[in-house]
């Protein structure tokens, strides 16, 4: 009987050591409202597209260096979006005019760049704008 209790006690001590570690989410929002976080440059020329992408890469590099593992990337604001859509136009922050095609898919680019850094990328959509 004592041997069974001893073995069970050891088993209960060993099992938690084999359990998966908790996944800690260290996230940051990247907002496109008024270009507060991103972008600062308009994508109206090939140089503008390159600069806009570099700005996002720089933000992601800083987040990775600060040990973040998740990005909440704003993809929709007030009826406009940061990805190609047949329903809503591109956000004016990308090119300076509503519906202006920036020449690339900002959401796909953000996802790709996050994954290169081992980070998750979640689409953040404003559904109830206030103010």
Residue ranges: model-predicted function:
Residues 9-18:
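Hydrophobic h-region of N-terminal signal peptides that target proteins for export
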Residues 1-4:
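Positively charged n-region of N-terminal signal peptides that target proteins for export
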């Amino acid at each position: 009987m004592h041997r069974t209790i001893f073995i069970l006690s050891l088993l209960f001590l060993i099992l938690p050591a084999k359990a998966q570690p908790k996944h800690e989410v260290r996230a940051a929002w990247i907002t496109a409202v008024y270009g507060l976080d991103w972008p600062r440059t308009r994508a109206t020329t090939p140089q503008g597209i390159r600069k806009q992408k570099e700005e996002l890469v720089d933000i992601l590099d800083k987040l990775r260096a600060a040990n973040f593992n998740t990005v909440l990337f704003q993809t929709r604001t007030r009826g406009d979006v940061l990805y190609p859509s047949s329903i809503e136009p591109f956000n004016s922050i990308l090119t300076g005019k509503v519906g202006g095609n920036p020449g690339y898919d900002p959401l796909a680019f953000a996802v790709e760049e996050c994954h290169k850094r081992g980070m998750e990328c979640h689409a953040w959509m404003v559904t109830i704008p206030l103010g």
